[in-house]
Amino acid sequence: MSKIIGIDLGTTNSAVAVLEGTEPKIIANPEGNRTTPSVVSFKNGEIIVGDAAKRQAVTNPDTVISIKSKMGTSEKVSANGKEYTPQEISAMILQYLKGYAEEYLGEKVTKAVITVPAYFNDAQRQATKDAGKIAGLEVERIVNEPTAAALAYGLDKTDKEEKILVFDLGGGTFDVSILELGDGVFDVLATAGDNKLGGDDFDQKIIDYMVEEFKKENGIDLSTDKMALQRLKDAAEKAKKDLSGVTSTQISLPFITAGEAGPLHLEMTLTRAKFDDLTRDLVERTKTPVRQALSDAGLSLSDIDEVILVGGSTRIPAVVEAVKAETGKEPNKSVNPDEVVAMGAAIQGGVISGDVKDVVLLDVTPLSLGIETMGGVFTKLIERNTTIPTSKSQVFSTAADNQPAVDIHVLQGERPMAADNKTLGRFQLTDIPAAPRGVPQIEVTFDIDKNGIVSVKAKDLGTQKEQTIVIQSNSGLTDEEIERMMKDAEANAEADAKRKAEVELRNEVDQAIFATEKTIKETEGKGFDTERDAAQSALDELKKAQESGNLDDMKAKLEALNEKAQALAVKLYEQAAAAQQAQAGAEGAQATDNSGDDVVDGEFTEK
């Protein structure tokens, strides 16, 4: 069975891991980094992902960042003269991760476990699964990020019973999950969160502050300048990271814009105290989900044994202090906040493939599910924090006499009125026999699978007619769209592979030309003109092919040159070996001739 890789598809950074034996291992990207920026850029028809894309974000307007924040929406991004869905951009990141995982493993990868924030709704989960499919991956399981982190933390502690609180503050989302660990069972008791809170918001506070200060000083609003704004974003992210280790950092952006008198520069000092002041409201927002999760789990702070920090934003000192103050505990530092989620996903891949034994993962649905009933009321069928997979049915009836059809409006959320919750989808059950209101029996059944993806069935118990839908939100892609995007992704992968092969061939040609010219020069006047002339002729042919740019011709001429150059090199080595042998023979003969020169006669007297 092929390996199932674990992928943490993050807002700011992503990571991929694989199980080696029973240990999860993070796979480094081609640049040697263990996490990859979730950035995609387009240049001259080429798709660039990761570190290289992030480096050119300032100068390349066709760069897409933080696409995860748009997952599950119908919003598209414009780049490269086209419009892309969030699923397509995410698929490009997944394809890149998949590609370097395949290089590391030396085999094709077709299956993955992908993580999502615990508080992702159905549309966002479905979009993630679609992105995987477009990237050529069979998504074996969608796992909540805090749950994956708990798996990685607790894999070697399966004999120990404890309750842990996972505090996961990433680039764009925030989750808190409470789990009970014991006997290899990872049981999620409750989860809470905020899908609109993360490191990007902390960056934005610094950006707003820089824009405001610069405007006060120079009267120019940098927020209207796209390139300046990207430079501000880079500087804000760097300053935020610096302030995790030092109490003050210098922000220096020369030539940020131009005024009437000429170029203007942005120079300022940002202290940790000022940063804490700017982001106080964001840190405050992390407290409510912690309290909510504890309340839903029916636990008090004293019941929690360990607090695990996940996500790069948990390195912010004010966040760490807030966690300490809120939980009364020193956070556990045994896991790497940037890598632990991907490692947990790889472990779940091992559970699915059977490589990891005696581990059971019981996750929950983060939000309540139900339908709209008379008066616009939201009637819940499945309460939040219900263990999944699960199924729940309830019987409803018609609201009017002789009603021929019922509209089923499926919702997700916690508010009492339907209008205040998230619509997952609508469908209709038709051909209900004429009857007074309240007589027909319509059974509505909700199913949530292990990935947290919802399907709903409505059945007329009188006629046994039923209608089933797997929820397709307004951002959902049809099978045809996914198929088309998969083909596009495959074509891009082929084009990338072709481009890579072309670069490698050109490099080989350059190297061969250089090496052969050197050998021809070194063999001048050494007596094997036939081989030198043949190599020179093949070299001239390759140079012509190089100028023409015909790859097939270059390949053929390169092979011919290698053959002739090899023959020349053999002659050179044969000559060198013969000379060496002759020298060794001469030295041996000289030693023999001189062997009697230093002989002294001695006298021997017998006593």
From Swiss-Prot:
Residues where Phosphothreonine is found: T173
One Pfam family here: HSP70
Region (Disordered) location: 579-607
Record key words, sorted: ATP-binding, Chaperone, Nucleotide-binding, Phosphoprotein, Stress response
InterPro entries hit by this protein: ATPase_NBD (IPR043129), Chaperone_DnaK (IPR012725), Heat_shock_70_CS (IPR018181), HSP70_C_sf (IPR029048), HSP70_peptide-bd_sf (IPR029047), Hsp_70_fam (IPR013126)
Record's compositionally biased regions (Acidic residues): 595-607
Keyword Chaperone: yes
GO molecular function: ATP binding; ATP-dependent protein folding chaperone; unfolded protein binding
Protein purpose: Acts as a chaperone.
HAMAP family xrefs: DnaK (MF_00332)
Protein name: Chaperone protein DnaK
